[in-house]
Amino acid sequence: MTVIYFVLAALALGFLILIHELGHLLAAKAVGMTVESFSIGFGPALVRKKMGSIEYRIGAIPFGGYVRIKGMDRNDKEISEDREKTVYDIPGGFFSKSPWKRIFVLAAGPLANILVALFAFGILYFSGGRTKPFSEHTSIVGWAHPSLEQKGLRPGDRIFLCNGQVYSGNKMAFSSSLLDRKLSLQGEHPAYFSEAESFSLDVPFNPSLEGVPCLGASYLLYRGSEPLPEKSPLIDAGLSEGDRLVWMDGALVFSGVQVSQILNEKKAFLRIERQGKIVFVRQSRVLAGDLQLTSYFKNELIDCQYEAGLKGKWASLYMLPYIINSDGFVESKINLLNTDQQSLDYHLELGDRIVAVDGIPVMSNADILRLVQDHRVSLIFQRMSSGQLSVLDQKAADKAFIDSYDMDDLLRVAGSVGEEREVSHLGEYRLVTRVQPKPWVHIYSEELLDKQRALASKFRDEQEKRYYLERIESEKQRISLGIPLKDLAVQYNPAPLVLMGESISDSLRTVKALGSGRLSPQWLSGPVGIVRILHTGWSMGIPEALSWIGLISINLAVLNLLPIPVLDGGYILLCLWESVSRRRLNMRLIEKGLVPFMILLILFFVFLTLQDLSRVFIG
Protein backbone atom coordinates (compact mmCIF):
# COMPACT_ATOMS: atom_id res chain seq x y z
CA MET A 1 0.00 0.00 0.00
CA THR A 2 2.94 2.36 0.66
CA VAL A 3 3.91 2.23 -3.02
CA ILE A 4 0.32 3.00 -4.04
CA TYR A 5 0.19 5.99 -1.67
CA PHE A 6 3.52 7.23 -3.03
CA VAL A 7 2.24 7.01 -6.62
CA LEU A 8 -0.98 8.82 -5.62
CA ALA A 9 1.07 11.53 -3.89
CA ALA A 10 3.31 12.06 -6.93
CA LEU A 11 0.26 12.15 -9.21
CA ALA A 12 -1.45 14.70 -6.94
CA LEU A 13 1.57 17.03 -7.06
CA GLY A 14 1.84 16.56 -10.82
CA PHE A 15 -1.87 17.32 -11.14
CA LEU A 16 -1.50 20.61 -9.24
CA ILE A 17 1.39 21.67 -11.48
CA LEU A 18 -0.60 20.60 -14.55
CA ILE A 19 -3.61 22.67 -13.47
CA HIS A 20 -1.40 25.70 -12.86
CA GLU A 21 0.19 25.55 -16.31
CA LEU A 22 -3.15 24.71 -17.92
CA GLY A 23 -4.51 27.96 -16.49
CA HIS A 24 -1.75 29.87 -18.29
CA LEU A 25 -2.33 27.89 -21.51
CA LEU A 26 -6.09 28.44 -21.71
CA ALA A 27 -5.79 32.13 -20.82
CA ALA A 28 -3.07 32.67 -23.44
CA LYS A 29 -5.18 31.05 -26.14
CA ALA A 30 -8.23 33.03 -25.01
CA VAL A 31 -6.48 36.39 -25.62
CA GLY A 32 -4.97 35.31 -28.94
CA MET A 33 -1.40 34.50 -27.92
CA THR A 34 0.51 31.79 -29.79
CA VAL A 35 1.61 28.99 -27.43
CA GLU A 36 4.72 27.12 -28.58
CA SER A 37 5.21 24.53 -25.83
CA PHE A 38 3.59 23.24 -22.66
CA SER A 39 5.85 21.44 -20.16
CA ILE A 40 5.45 19.70 -16.82
CA GLY A 41 8.96 19.76 -15.33
CA PHE A 42 12.15 21.39 -16.58
CA GLY A 43 15.25 20.17 -18.38
CA PRO A 44 15.51 17.51 -21.12
CA ALA A 45 12.19 16.11 -22.28
CA LEU A 46 11.44 12.56 -21.16
CA VAL A 47 8.27 12.54 -23.26
CA ARG A 48 7.26 14.97 -26.00
CA LYS A 49 4.36 15.09 -28.44
CA LYS A 50 3.30 17.84 -30.85
CA MET A 51 -0.41 18.47 -31.17
CA GLY A 52 -1.29 21.25 -33.60
CA SER A 53 1.14 24.14 -33.06
CA ILE A 54 1.91 23.21 -29.42
CA GLU A 55 4.60 20.80 -28.25
CA TYR A 56 3.63 19.01 -25.02
CA ARG A 57 6.53 17.83 -22.83
CA ILE A 58 7.33 16.09 -19.55
CA GLY A 59 10.69 17.38 -18.26
CA ALA A 60 13.32 15.42 -16.36
CA ILE A 61 13.47 17.85 -13.41
CA PRO A 62 10.14 17.81 -11.51
CA PHE A 63 10.44 21.29 -9.97
CA GLY A 64 7.39 22.74 -11.69
CA GLY A 65 6.52 23.50 -15.28
CA TYR A 66 6.12 26.25 -17.84
CA VAL A 67 4.12 27.46 -20.83
CA ARG A 68 6.31 28.96 -23.57
CA ILE A 69 4.48 31.71 -25.43
CA LYS A 70 5.77 33.16 -28.66
CA GLY A 71 7.86 36.30 -28.23
CA MET A 72 8.53 35.96 -24.50
CA ASP A 73 12.27 36.51 -24.98
CA ARG A 74 14.56 38.47 -27.31
CA ASN A 75 16.03 35.33 -28.88
CA ASP A 76 12.86 34.64 -30.80
CA LYS A 77 13.54 33.62 -34.42
CA GLU A 78 11.54 36.53 -35.90
CA ILE A 79 13.61 39.10 -33.95
CA SER A 80 16.88 37.43 -34.96
CA GLU A 81 15.95 37.71 -38.65
CA ASP A 82 14.83 41.35 -38.39
CA ARG A 83 17.01 43.47 -36.08
CA GLU A 84 14.52 46.35 -36.15
CA LYS A 85 11.78 44.21 -34.64
CA THR A 86 11.18 43.98 -30.86
CA VAL A 87 9.18 41.48 -28.82
CA TYR A 88 6.29 43.92 -29.04
CA ASP A 89 6.14 43.54 -32.84
CA ILE A 90 5.68 39.74 -33.04
CA PRO A 91 2.14 38.79 -34.17
CA GLY A 92 0.48 36.55 -31.57
CA GLY A 93 3.40 37.19 -29.23
CA PHE A 94 3.18 37.65 -25.47
CA PHE A 95 4.22 41.31 -25.56
CA SER A 96 2.05 42.11 -28.56
CA LYS A 97 -0.94 42.12 -26.23
CA SER A 98 -1.85 44.87 -23.79
CA PRO A 99 -0.37 44.78 -20.26
CA TRP A 100 -3.75 43.88 -18.78
CA LYS A 101 -4.15 40.87 -21.08
CA ARG A 102 -0.65 39.74 -20.10
CA ILE A 103 -1.58 40.14 -16.43
CA PHE A 104 -4.67 38.01 -17.07
CA VAL A 105 -2.51 35.24 -18.56
CA LEU A 106 0.05 35.44 -15.75
CA ALA A 107 -2.60 35.39 -13.01
CA ALA A 108 -4.53 32.52 -14.61
CA GLY A 109 -2.10 29.87 -13.27
CA PRO A 110 -2.39 30.87 -9.59
CA LEU A 111 -6.12 31.43 -10.08
CA ALA A 112 -6.44 27.85 -11.38
CA ASN A 113 -4.71 26.61 -8.22
CA ILE A 114 -7.08 28.65 -6.05
CA LEU A 115 -10.07 27.15 -7.87
CA VAL A 116 -8.67 23.63 -7.38
CA ALA A 117 -8.24 24.34 -3.66
CA LEU A 118 -11.79 25.66 -3.44
CA PHE A 119 -13.04 22.56 -5.27
CA ALA A 120 -11.08 20.22 -2.94
CA PHE A 121 -12.29 22.04 0.17
CA GLY A 122 -15.84 22.00 -1.24
CA ILE A 123 -15.79 18.22 -1.74
CA LEU A 124 -14.40 17.86 1.76
CA TYR A 125 -17.15 20.05 3.23
CA PHE A 126 -20.09 18.42 1.47
CA SER A 127 -18.79 14.92 2.26
CA GLY A 128 -18.90 15.70 5.98
CA GLY A 129 -15.33 16.82 6.65
CA ARG A 130 -12.66 14.90 8.54
CA THR A 131 -12.78 12.84 11.72
CA LYS A 132 -10.05 14.24 13.96
CA PRO A 133 -8.94 13.79 17.58
CA PHE A 134 -10.66 16.27 19.88
CA SER A 135 -7.25 17.54 21.06
CA GLU A 136 -6.21 18.68 17.57
CA HIS A 137 -8.71 21.51 17.11
CA THR A 138 -9.99 22.27 20.60
CA SER A 139 -9.55 25.70 22.15
CA ILE A 140 -9.11 24.07 25.57
CA VAL A 141 -5.53 23.77 26.83
CA GLY A 142 -4.30 20.29 27.77
CA TRP A 143 -0.77 21.31 28.74
CA ALA A 144 1.07 24.64 28.81
CA HIS A 145 4.79 25.33 28.55
CA PRO A 146 6.22 26.32 31.96
CA SER A 147 6.98 29.87 30.75
CA LEU A 148 3.33 30.31 29.74
CA GLU A 149 2.09 28.64 32.93
CA GLN A 150 4.05 31.19 34.96
CA LYS A 151 2.14 33.92 33.10
CA GLY A 152 -1.20 32.37 34.04
CA LEU A 153 -2.06 29.87 31.28
CA ARG A 154 -3.20 26.62 32.91
CA PRO A 155 -4.42 23.21 31.72
CA GLY A 156 -8.18 23.42 31.23
CA ASP A 157 -8.14 27.08 30.17
CA ARG A 158 -9.94 28.08 27.00
CA ILE A 159 -8.23 30.30 24.41
CA PHE A 160 -10.37 32.54 22.19
CA LEU A 161 -7.78 34.68 20.36
CA CYS A 162 -4.16 33.99 19.45
CA ASN A 163 -2.10 36.91 18.09
CA GLY A 164 -5.29 38.66 17.07
CA GLN A 165 -6.88 35.71 15.23
CA VAL A 166 -9.64 33.32 16.28
CA TYR A 167 -7.92 30.38 17.95
CA SER A 168 -8.23 27.06 16.11
CA GLY A 169 -6.01 24.72 18.13
CA ASN A 170 -2.50 24.03 19.37
CA LYS A 171 -1.06 23.97 15.83
CA MET A 172 -2.08 27.61 15.52
CA ALA A 173 -0.27 28.45 18.76
CA PHE A 174 2.85 26.77 17.42
CA SER A 175 2.76 28.42 13.98
CA SER A 176 1.88 31.85 15.42
CA SER A 177 4.77 31.75 17.86
CA LEU A 178 7.09 30.45 15.13
CA LEU A 179 6.17 33.26 12.73
CA ASP A 180 5.73 36.13 15.22
CA ARG A 181 8.17 35.06 17.97
CA LYS A 182 5.50 35.91 20.55
CA LEU A 183 2.11 34.80 21.84
CA SER A 184 -0.73 37.18 22.66
CA LEU A 185 -3.56 35.09 24.09
CA GLN A 186 -7.04 36.01 25.25
CA GLY A 187 -9.40 33.52 26.85
CA GLU A 188 -11.01 32.40 30.09
CA HIS A 189 -10.47 30.13 33.05
CA PRO A 190 -13.69 28.05 32.77
CA ALA A 191 -16.01 27.50 35.73
CA TYR A 192 -14.78 24.05 36.74
CA PHE A 193 -14.64 24.81 40.49
CA SER A 194 -15.59 28.50 40.63
CA GLU A 195 -16.88 31.33 38.46
CA ALA A 196 -15.39 31.70 34.97
CA GLU A 197 -12.71 34.38 34.76
CA SER A 198 -11.22 36.11 31.70
CA PHE A 199 -7.49 36.30 31.15
CA SER A 200 -5.01 37.74 28.68
CA LEU A 201 -1.26 37.34 28.37
CA ASP A 202 1.45 38.64 26.08
CA VAL A 203 4.78 36.83 26.20
CA PRO A 204 7.80 36.41 23.88
CA PHE A 205 8.05 32.81 22.70
CA ASN A 206 10.35 31.13 20.18
CA PRO A 207 9.49 27.45 19.58
CA SER A 208 12.82 26.92 17.84
CA LEU A 209 14.43 27.42 21.26
CA GLU A 210 11.65 26.60 23.73
CA GLY A 211 9.65 23.87 21.99
CA VAL A 212 5.88 23.51 21.78
CA PRO A 213 3.95 26.31 23.55
CA CYS A 214 0.87 24.25 24.44
CA LEU A 215 -1.17 21.16 23.62
CA GLY A 216 -4.91 20.68 23.24
CA ALA A 217 -7.03 18.94 25.87
CA SER A 218 -7.76 15.25 25.43
CA TYR A 219 -10.50 12.98 26.78
CA LEU A 220 -7.99 10.40 28.20
CA LEU A 221 -10.24 7.42 27.48
CA TYR A 222 -9.53 3.77 28.14
CA ARG A 223 -11.09 2.14 25.08
CA GLY A 224 -10.56 -1.49 26.09
CA SER A 225 -9.65 -2.52 22.55
CA GLU A 226 -5.98 -2.48 23.55
CA PRO A 227 -5.54 -4.64 26.69
CA LEU A 228 -3.53 -3.43 29.65
CA PRO A 229 0.01 -4.83 29.91
CA GLU A 230 0.31 -7.65 32.43
CA LYS A 231 2.62 -5.52 34.59
CA SER A 232 0.44 -2.40 34.44
CA PRO A 233 -0.17 -0.78 37.86
CA LEU A 234 -3.87 -0.61 36.86
CA ILE A 235 -4.25 -4.26 35.86
CA ASP A 236 -6.48 -4.96 38.89
CA ALA A 237 -8.29 -1.60 38.92
CA GLY A 238 -11.40 -3.01 37.21
CA LEU A 239 -11.39 -0.55 34.32
CA SER A 240 -14.07 -0.86 31.66
CA GLU A 241 -14.31 0.35 28.08
CA GLY A 242 -15.21 4.03 28.02
CA ASP A 243 -13.69 4.91 31.40
CA ARG A 244 -12.14 8.38 31.32
CA LEU A 245 -9.35 9.60 33.59
CA VAL A 246 -10.46 13.02 34.89
CA TRP A 247 -8.63 13.64 38.18
CA MET A 248 -5.24 12.80 39.63
CA ASP A 249 -3.65 13.82 42.93
CA GLY A 250 -5.82 16.87 43.44
CA ALA A 251 -5.96 18.18 39.88
CA LEU A 252 -8.24 17.79 36.89
CA VAL A 253 -6.15 16.23 34.13
CA PHE A 254 -6.49 17.32 30.52
CA SER A 255 -3.72 15.54 28.59
CA GLY A 256 -1.32 12.62 28.65
CA VAL A 257 1.59 15.06 28.99
CA GLN A 258 0.05 16.56 32.13
CA VAL A 259 -0.46 13.05 33.56
CA SER A 260 3.17 12.16 32.86
CA GLN A 261 4.30 15.44 34.40
CA ILE A 262 2.43 14.73 37.66
CA LEU A 263 3.80 11.19 37.79
CA ASN A 264 7.41 12.31 37.36
CA GLU A 265 7.51 15.40 39.59
CA LYS A 266 8.55 13.57 42.81
CA LYS A 267 5.80 15.17 44.85
CA ALA A 268 3.65 13.72 47.61
CA PHE A 269 -0.12 14.28 47.65
CA LEU A 270 -1.03 15.39 51.17
CA ARG A 271 -4.33 15.72 53.03
CA ILE A 272 -3.91 18.56 55.52
CA GLU A 273 -5.87 19.89 58.49
CA ARG A 274 -5.40 23.66 58.44
CA GLN A 275 -7.27 25.88 60.91
CA GLY A 276 -10.16 23.46 61.16
CA LYS A 277 -10.45 22.91 57.40
CA ILE A 278 -9.28 20.12 55.09
CA VAL A 279 -7.01 21.15 52.22
CA PHE A 280 -5.00 19.14 49.71
CA VAL A 281 -1.49 20.06 48.57
CA ARG A 282 1.24 18.51 46.44
CA GLN A 283 4.60 18.96 48.14
CA SER A 284 8.05 18.09 46.78
CA ARG A 285 9.90 15.08 48.22
CA VAL A 286 13.58 15.89 48.75
CA LEU A 287 16.62 13.75 49.56
CA ALA A 288 17.59 14.35 53.18
CA GLY A 289 21.21 14.80 52.12
CA ASP A 290 20.20 17.87 50.06
CA LEU A 291 18.73 19.70 53.08
CA GLN A 292 20.31 21.89 55.78
CA LEU A 293 19.84 19.60 58.80
CA THR A 294 21.24 20.31 62.25
CA SER A 295 23.02 17.53 64.15
CA TYR A 296 20.06 17.31 66.51
CA PHE A 297 17.56 16.85 63.68
CA LYS A 298 19.81 14.30 61.94
CA ASN A 299 19.62 12.19 65.09
CA GLU A 300 15.85 12.69 65.20
CA LEU A 301 15.63 11.60 61.56
CA ILE A 302 17.67 8.45 62.25
CA ASP A 303 15.35 7.58 65.15
CA CYS A 304 12.32 8.17 62.89
CA GLN A 305 13.94 6.02 60.20
CA TYR A 306 14.35 3.17 62.69
CA GLU A 307 10.73 3.52 63.84
CA ALA A 308 9.51 3.47 60.21
CA GLY A 309 11.50 0.31 59.51
CA LEU A 310 13.56 1.91 56.74
CA LYS A 311 17.06 0.71 55.90
CA GLY A 312 20.00 2.49 54.31
CA LYS A 313 21.80 5.76 55.00
CA TRP A 314 19.73 8.65 56.29
CA ALA A 315 21.01 10.96 53.52
CA SER A 316 19.45 8.72 50.85
CA LEU A 317 15.96 8.96 52.35
CA TYR A 318 13.24 11.10 50.79
CA MET A 319 11.51 13.48 53.16
CA LEU A 320 9.30 16.55 53.14
CA PRO A 321 11.36 19.77 53.57
CA TYR A 322 9.85 20.49 57.01
CA ILE A 323 10.41 19.66 60.64
CA ILE A 324 7.35 17.56 61.51
CA ASN A 325 6.69 16.44 65.09
CA SER A 326 5.60 12.98 66.15
CA ASP A 327 1.90 13.88 65.79
CA GLY A 328 2.32 15.06 62.18
CA PHE A 329 2.27 18.83 62.85
CA VAL A 330 4.48 21.12 60.78
CA GLU A 331 6.84 23.09 63.04
CA SER A 332 9.13 24.81 60.53
CA LYS A 333 10.53 24.52 57.04
CA ILE A 334 14.00 23.29 56.09
CA ASN A 335 16.12 25.03 53.47
CA LEU A 336 18.15 23.41 50.73
CA LEU A 337 21.91 23.09 51.03
CA ASN A 338 22.50 24.46 47.53
CA THR A 339 19.89 26.99 46.47
CA ASP A 340 21.83 27.87 43.30
CA GLN A 341 21.20 24.49 41.64
CA GLN A 342 17.54 24.03 42.58
CA SER A 343 14.65 25.73 44.31
CA LEU A 344 11.64 24.51 46.24
CA ASP A 345 8.02 25.55 46.46
CA TYR A 346 6.81 25.36 50.05
CA HIS A 347 3.05 24.70 50.25
CA LEU A 348 2.68 23.77 53.94
CA GLU A 349 2.18 26.29 56.74
CA LEU A 350 3.23 26.37 60.37
CA GLY A 351 0.63 24.43 62.38
CA ASP A 352 -0.61 22.29 59.48
CA ARG A 353 -1.28 18.67 60.43
CA ILE A 354 -0.65 15.97 57.84
CA VAL A 355 -3.42 13.38 58.10
CA ALA A 356 -2.82 11.39 54.88
CA VAL A 357 -0.01 10.85 52.37
CA ASP A 358 -0.88 9.70 48.82
CA GLY A 359 -4.37 8.75 50.03
CA ILE A 360 -3.15 6.68 52.98
CA PRO A 361 -4.03 7.91 56.53
CA VAL A 362 -1.06 8.55 58.85
CA MET A 363 -0.73 8.79 62.63
CA SER A 364 2.88 9.87 63.13
CA ASN A 365 5.93 11.38 61.49
CA ALA A 366 7.32 7.85 61.10
CA ASP A 367 4.29 6.95 58.95
CA ILE A 368 4.88 10.08 56.87
CA LEU A 369 8.57 9.29 56.38
CA ARG A 370 7.81 5.72 55.34
CA LEU A 371 5.16 6.72 52.79
CA VAL A 372 7.13 9.51 51.10
CA GLN A 373 9.84 7.05 50.00
CA ASP A 374 7.54 6.09 47.11
CA HIS A 375 4.80 7.88 45.24
CA ARG A 376 1.35 6.33 45.02
CA VAL A 377 -1.30 8.14 43.03
CA SER A 378 -5.00 8.65 43.58
CA LEU A 379 -7.15 8.60 40.44
CA ILE A 380 -10.77 9.30 39.60
CA PHE A 381 -12.32 7.74 36.50
CA GLN A 382 -15.58 8.84 34.89
CA ARG A 383 -17.83 6.23 33.34
CA MET A 384 -18.80 7.75 29.97
CA SER A 385 -22.19 6.96 28.42
CA SER A 386 -22.56 5.86 24.80
CA GLY A 387 -24.00 9.29 23.99
CA GLN A 388 -20.96 11.03 25.45
CA LEU A 389 -18.66 8.78 23.39
CA SER A 390 -20.38 9.52 20.07
CA VAL A 391 -18.64 11.65 17.44
CA LEU A 392 -19.51 15.33 17.93
CA ASP A 393 -19.34 18.26 15.59
CA GLN A 394 -16.14 20.12 16.40
CA LYS A 395 -18.00 23.43 16.87
CA ALA A 396 -20.00 21.98 19.77
CA ALA A 397 -17.25 19.78 21.18
CA ASP A 398 -15.59 22.34 23.48
CA LYS A 399 -18.83 23.16 25.30
CA ALA A 400 -19.64 19.45 25.59
CA PHE A 401 -16.19 18.84 27.10
CA ILE A 402 -16.60 21.54 29.76
CA ASP A 403 -20.19 20.48 30.51
CA SER A 404 -19.20 16.79 30.80
CA TYR A 405 -18.17 17.20 34.46
CA ASP A 406 -20.60 16.80 37.37
CA MET A 407 -18.52 18.88 39.73
CA ASP A 408 -20.65 18.22 42.84
CA ASP A 409 -20.12 14.46 42.62
CA LEU A 410 -16.50 14.80 41.52
CA LEU A 411 -15.61 17.10 44.43
CA ARG A 412 -17.35 14.80 46.92
CA VAL A 413 -15.32 11.81 45.71
CA ALA A 414 -12.05 13.78 45.54
CA GLY A 415 -12.62 15.28 48.99
CA SER A 416 -12.81 11.82 50.56
CA VAL A 417 -9.25 10.83 49.55
CA GLY A 418 -7.32 9.98 52.73
CA GLU A 419 -10.43 9.51 54.88
CA GLU A 420 -10.91 6.29 56.80
CA ARG A 421 -14.02 5.65 54.68
CA GLU A 422 -13.46 6.96 51.19
CA VAL A 423 -16.31 7.54 48.71
CA SER A 424 -15.23 4.93 46.17
CA HIS A 425 -18.31 5.32 43.89
CA LEU A 426 -20.66 8.22 43.33
CA GLY A 427 -22.74 8.76 40.20
CA GLU A 428 -20.51 8.27 37.17
CA TYR A 429 -17.26 8.65 39.15
CA ARG A 430 -15.05 5.97 40.68
CA LEU A 431 -12.06 6.46 42.95
CA VAL A 432 -8.92 4.34 42.55
CA THR A 433 -6.28 5.00 45.23
CA ARG A 434 -2.86 3.73 46.27
CA VAL A 435 -1.79 3.02 42.70
CA GLN A 436 1.98 2.44 42.53
CA PRO A 437 3.31 3.75 39.17
CA LYS A 438 6.37 2.07 37.66
CA PRO A 439 9.19 3.00 35.28
CA TRP A 440 8.16 2.46 31.65
CA VAL A 441 10.75 -0.29 31.16
CA HIS A 442 9.23 -2.30 34.07
CA ILE A 443 5.85 -2.36 32.31
CA TYR A 444 6.58 -2.69 28.60
CA SER A 445 9.02 -4.74 26.55
CA GLU A 446 12.27 -2.98 25.72
CA GLU A 447 11.94 -4.35 22.18
CA LEU A 448 9.43 -1.56 21.53
CA LEU A 449 12.36 0.88 21.64
CA ASP A 450 14.48 -1.00 19.09
CA LYS A 451 12.86 0.84 16.16
CA GLN A 452 13.63 4.22 17.76
CA ARG A 453 17.22 3.17 18.43
CA ALA A 454 17.60 2.06 14.80
CA LEU A 455 16.37 5.46 13.58
CA ALA A 456 18.69 7.32 15.95
CA SER A 457 21.67 5.25 14.82
CA LYS A 458 21.22 6.59 11.26
CA PHE A 459 22.15 10.13 12.29
CA ARG A 460 25.52 11.08 10.83
CA ASP A 461 26.18 13.74 13.42
CA GLU A 462 27.66 11.88 16.41
CA GLN A 463 26.53 14.52 18.90
CA GLU A 464 22.96 14.42 17.60
CA LYS A 465 22.99 10.60 17.57
CA ARG A 466 24.23 10.49 21.16
CA TYR A 467 21.57 13.00 22.23
CA TYR A 468 18.70 10.92 20.85
CA LEU A 469 20.07 7.63 22.17
CA GLU A 470 20.45 9.15 25.64
CA ARG A 471 16.93 10.52 25.39
CA ILE A 472 15.58 7.05 24.56
CA GLU A 473 17.38 5.61 27.59
CA SER A 474 15.98 8.34 29.86
CA GLU A 475 12.45 7.76 28.53
CA LYS A 476 12.73 4.13 29.65
CA GLN A 477 12.89 5.30 33.24
CA ARG A 478 9.94 7.67 33.09
CA ILE A 479 7.22 6.75 35.55
CA SER A 480 4.06 5.41 33.90
CA LEU A 481 0.58 4.11 34.73
CA GLY A 482 0.79 1.51 31.97
CA ILE A 483 -2.56 2.41 30.40
CA PRO A 484 -3.23 3.34 26.76
CA LEU A 485 -5.31 6.52 26.91
CA LYS A 486 -7.13 7.52 23.73
CA ASP A 487 -8.91 10.68 22.65
CA LEU A 488 -12.50 11.18 21.53
CA ALA A 489 -13.11 11.76 17.83
CA VAL A 490 -14.84 14.91 16.53
CA GLN A 491 -16.10 15.89 13.10
CA TYR A 492 -13.97 18.78 11.84
CA ASN A 493 -15.73 20.49 8.93
CA PRO A 494 -15.14 24.24 8.47
CA ALA A 495 -16.63 25.97 5.42
CA PRO A 496 -14.48 25.99 2.24
CA LEU A 497 -14.00 29.77 2.32
CA VAL A 498 -12.85 29.56 5.95
CA LEU A 499 -10.20 26.99 5.02
CA MET A 500 -9.22 29.13 2.04
CA GLY A 501 -8.83 32.23 4.19
CA GLU A 502 -6.80 30.42 6.84
CA SER A 503 -4.53 28.83 4.22
CA ILE A 504 -3.86 32.11 2.40
CA SER A 505 -3.27 33.95 5.68
CA ASP A 506 -0.82 31.29 6.91
CA SER A 507 1.04 31.34 3.59
CA LEU A 508 1.42 35.13 3.61
CA ARG A 509 2.56 35.15 7.24
CA THR A 510 5.12 32.45 6.41
CA VAL A 511 6.50 34.55 3.54
CA LYS A 512 6.66 37.60 5.81
CA ALA A 513 8.49 35.63 8.52
CA LEU A 514 10.97 34.27 5.97
CA GLY A 515 11.65 37.73 4.62
CA SER A 516 12.19 39.19 8.09
CA GLY A 517 14.47 36.34 9.14
CA ARG A 518 12.18 35.14 11.94
CA LEU A 519 11.59 31.80 10.17
CA SER A 520 14.39 29.49 9.08
CA PRO A 521 14.16 27.71 5.69
CA GLN A 522 14.61 24.45 7.62
CA TRP A 523 10.85 24.54 8.28
CA LEU A 524 10.07 24.50 4.54
CA SER A 525 9.63 21.58 2.14
CA GLY A 526 10.45 21.13 -1.53
CA PRO A 527 8.97 18.71 -4.08
CA VAL A 528 10.20 15.61 -2.22
CA GLY A 529 8.78 16.89 1.06
CA ILE A 530 5.46 17.74 -0.57
CA VAL A 531 5.21 14.21 -1.97
CA ARG A 532 5.90 12.85 1.53
CA ILE A 533 3.15 15.05 2.99
CA LEU A 534 0.69 13.92 0.34
CA HIS A 535 1.77 10.31 0.91
CA THR A 536 0.88 10.70 4.60
CA GLY A 537 -2.43 12.30 3.65
CA TRP A 538 -3.42 9.44 1.33
CA SER A 539 -2.45 6.87 3.99
CA MET A 540 -4.88 8.58 6.42
CA GLY A 541 -7.76 8.52 3.94
CA ILE A 542 -9.28 10.52 1.11
CA PRO A 543 -10.57 13.42 3.30
CA GLU A 544 -7.09 14.06 4.71
CA ALA A 545 -5.57 13.85 1.21
CA LEU A 546 -8.13 16.38 -0.10
CA SER A 547 -7.23 18.75 2.72
CA TRP A 548 -3.51 18.60 1.87
CA ILE A 549 -4.17 18.94 -1.86
CA GLY A 550 -6.15 22.11 -1.20
CA LEU A 551 -3.53 23.50 1.17
CA ILE A 552 -0.61 22.79 -1.19
CA SER A 553 -2.55 24.22 -4.13
CA ILE A 554 -3.07 27.46 -2.17
CA ASN A 555 0.63 27.57 -1.32
CA LEU A 556 1.55 27.14 -5.00
CA ALA A 557 -0.74 30.04 -5.89
CA VAL A 558 0.70 32.33 -3.20
CA LEU A 559 4.28 31.36 -4.09
CA ASN A 560 3.80 32.15 -7.77
CA LEU A 561 2.14 35.49 -7.03
CA LEU A 562 5.09 36.76 -5.00
CA PRO A 563 6.57 39.89 -6.66
CA ILE A 564 9.88 38.15 -7.38
CA PRO A 565 11.45 38.16 -10.86
CA VAL A 566 11.08 34.83 -12.76
CA LEU A 567 7.81 34.12 -10.88
CA ASP A 568 4.35 35.08 -12.17
CA GLY A 569 4.11 37.83 -9.56
CA GLY A 570 7.35 39.41 -10.77
CA TYR A 571 6.12 39.59 -14.36
CA ILE A 572 2.77 40.97 -13.18
CA LEU A 573 4.64 43.74 -11.37
CA LEU A 574 6.53 44.62 -14.57
CA CYS A 575 3.29 44.73 -16.56
CA LEU A 576 1.71 47.00 -13.97
CA TRP A 577 4.72 49.34 -14.16
CA GLU A 578 4.43 49.37 -17.97
CA SER A 579 0.72 50.17 -17.76
CA VAL A 580 1.22 53.01 -15.28
CA SER A 581 4.32 54.53 -16.90
CA ARG A 582 3.07 53.96 -20.49
CA ARG A 583 6.62 53.01 -21.49
CA ARG A 584 7.73 49.76 -23.06
CA LEU A 585 10.00 47.47 -21.06
CA ASN A 586 13.71 47.28 -21.81
CA MET A 587 13.92 43.53 -22.41
CA ARG A 588 17.70 43.49 -22.64
CA LEU A 589 17.97 44.97 -19.14
CA ILE A 590 15.20 42.77 -17.74
CA GLU A 591 16.73 39.53 -19.05
CA LYS A 592 20.08 40.43 -17.51
CA GLY A 593 18.33 41.16 -14.21
CA LEU A 594 16.48 37.84 -14.27
CA VAL A 595 19.65 35.72 -14.41
CA PRO A 596 20.72 36.08 -10.74
CA PHE A 597 17.15 35.51 -9.55
CA MET A 598 16.90 32.37 -11.70
CA ILE A 599 20.16 31.07 -10.22
CA LEU A 600 18.99 31.84 -6.67
CA LEU A 601 15.66 30.11 -7.31
CA ILE A 602 17.37 26.97 -8.65
CA LEU A 603 19.77 26.92 -5.69
CA PHE A 604 16.84 27.37 -3.30
CA PHE A 605 14.97 24.40 -4.80
CA VAL A 606 18.15 22.31 -4.73
CA PHE A 607 18.60 23.21 -1.04
CA LEU A 608 15.00 22.24 -0.25
CA THR A 609 15.34 18.97 -2.16
CA LEU A 610 18.57 18.02 -0.36
CA GLN A 611 16.94 18.96 2.94
CA ASP A 612 13.93 16.77 2.12
CA LEU A 613 16.18 13.86 1.12
CA SER A 614 18.14 14.17 4.36
CA ARG A 615 14.85 13.90 6.28
CA VAL A 616 13.98 10.74 4.34
CA PHE A 617 17.30 8.93 4.66
CA ILE A 618 18.76 10.37 7.87
CA GLY A 619 15.74 11.43 9.88
Swiss-Prot record:
A GO molecular-function descriptor: metalloendopeptidase activity
Q: Which InterPro entries match?
A: Pept_M50_Zn (IPR004387), Peptidase_M50 (IPR008915)
Give an example GO cellular component term for this record: plasma membrane
Please state the Enzyme Commission number of this protein. 3.4.24.-
Q: Does the keyword Cell inner membrane apply?
A: yes
Against PROSITE patterns, the record matches this protein to:
ZINC_PROTEASE (PS00142)
- Tell me which residues bind Zn(2+): 20, 24
Q: How does it sit in the membrane?
A: Multi-pass membrane protein
GO biological process annotations for this chain's record?
proteolysis
Question: From what superkingdom does this record's organism come?
Answer: Bacteria
* Subcellular localization(s) per the UniProt record: Cell inner membrane
Transmembrane stretches, start-end: 103-125, 558-580, 593-610
Q: What class of enzyme is it?
A: hydrolase
**Keywords, in A-Z order:** Cell inner membrane, Cell membrane, Hydrolase, Membrane, Metal-binding, Metalloprotease, Protease, Transmembrane, Transmembrane helix, Zinc
List of catalytic residues: 21
Give the cofactors, semicolon-separated.
Zn(2+)
Family designation: Belongs to the peptidase M50B family.
- Any idea what this protein is called? Putative zinc metalloprotease TC_0344
